[in-house]
Amino acid sequence: MEKLHIRNISKLYGSIKAVDNLSLDLHEGELLAILGPSGCGKSTLLGCIAGIETPEKGEITLGGRCLFSAEKGIQVPPEHRKIGFVFQNYALWPHMTVNENVAYPLKMAKVPSKERLEIVEHNLNLVELCAKGHRYPHELSGGEQQRVALSRALVMNPDLLLLDEPLSNLDARLRETMQLEIRKIQQKLNLSVIHVTHDQAEAMAMADRIAVMYQGSVIQKGTPHEIYENPKTQFVASFVGTNTILTGTRTHGGEHIRIAGAARLRIPVALPSYKERENQPLLVAVRPEDVALYAMNEGPVRDLPTAVVSNKVYKGAHILYEIICDQVIIRVQAHPTDRFAVGERVYFHPTKSVVIDENGNAPLM
């Protein structure tokens, strides 16, 4: 069941289209991640949904209730939309205790004092902060402040929760912990959530679906697996993961792509829907984990192309190499026990790839 409908929303700042004729749906109980680079319109879109930005055109409905319609002249105020919002900087009142911060929306709604206390206690228990209700924001860690902001956003039992990069100010370990905590709470309460982030790992870890935004538009939607395995455009292929994007042409028979600038390099690929595209240019995305490296003294790989290791970065769980084959640079992710030196010549074997055509469309493979 669809919870939120966004139809043809546009938001302008002068001549700049921050959101450009965007349409999007959110399902009941779903966590949808809006993933994109800085300046692509992610936060502006949240502002339009929450009512703190006014679009120039389009329509937004939540649970069957129209929140905004340019055509009908409808603009429901933010406080009447039943939407919770967690901002990037948390926006906690520094002169209020945790209890007072969480209770503030209830106080504004004139909820009786006794009922307020019960609701605040329940919501702080939800984020495991009930024992710190008497503290002030500056007495809390970043993760605790984030949980207070989340508790406050949930205190009015919203129909929709919006998260605007709330984890970006946390250190890496705490960020991973909070990803799990937010997801656990979302699933426990069956919340409908839109989570904005520029962090692809965060989107992959938390979301049921991902919508990739670029220049004010959603250019691809799908599950994390679909987005990662089948990018539809060169931008998605380069933004999600660390793909190497190569240009090539389909060889006779269609089982390989001949890469421009590397005479011996053939990338294996299945192209059943591109039989008519022989000798026409195609873009190929190759993920680092889909390339194997072999030492030159390994006999069974003599027929493979060779390259020179130009760079290596130790990542702990793996080593990220850059290798050069003729004029082509390819990234390779290898096990830390597979050690190759910069300047060493190696065999390499791309095991699979994703093909993106000139129009930005990619076949499902």
Predicted regions mapped to residue ranges:
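The feature captures the beta-strand-to-loop junction immediately N-terminal to the Walker
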Residues: 35-37
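ABC ATPase nucleotide-binding domains
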Residues: 81-84, 88, 92-235
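Glycine/charge-rich catalytic "coupling/switch" loops of P-loop NTPases
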Residues: 256, 261-311, 338-365
